[in-house]
Amino acid sequence: MSEGDTTGAGVAKPGGPRLSDVQMTEVRLTTPVSDADIASLKLGDIVYLDGVLYTAREGVYRKVVDEGCGLPDGVAALTNVNFHCSPAASVKPDGTYAVEAVTATASFRFGKSFTRWFERSGAKVIVGKAGLTETAYREYFVPHGAVYLTTVGYGLGATYGRAIKRVVDVHWLKELGIAQAMWVLEVEKLGPFLVEGDHEGRSLFALANQEINLRLDEVYRGLPKYAMSRFGETTSRKDEVV
């Protein structure tokens, strides 16, 4: 796989864990997370975060990875959790900021930067949308002892926002704008998130895809005969063009 090829969830290998093994245990982690925390997480665990984390997406990655700026002073000591998201931020009457909702962004777009990002940021948890391939987890995450948490569905931006207690700091706001700036946020029970990529590089989505794919032929066999013979209608998986 090329360095930037991180789209999709990949395919889990036969003989590994099954979807029925997923327990979906609820877990609360306090940042910065420890190596023991990382090792304890299992695929499908429901995670809530307490403490401090920061937002970082394309603009911040460009500053840190491409321009070599490093994280702003003090951030790495506070937290090792990076949320791929944009905040809905506003200025309060006293001049401080409020973040009332966040919108996660798809993490595959950062694939080519992950190795250098982990080296320069010390991040151990990436929170984002949609997940990556198992190849990406094993190539980029596992060597740095990191895991991936995915947001759950759409429409939870306000729910996540209610867990934000305060804005600790904001960096590169004038240069990058609200959506791309780094927002350092104190949170309490921020979630739910799902463990999508664990410390061994396994993917929850790939595990689900594997079991779904095994039963697709059975699904096709149960389809009724199409009535109008329109282009693209079929009751055979092998005849599908996609």
Predicted regions and their residues:
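Feature captures the catalytic cores and cofactor-binding loops of soluble hydro-lyases/lyases
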Residues: 55-191
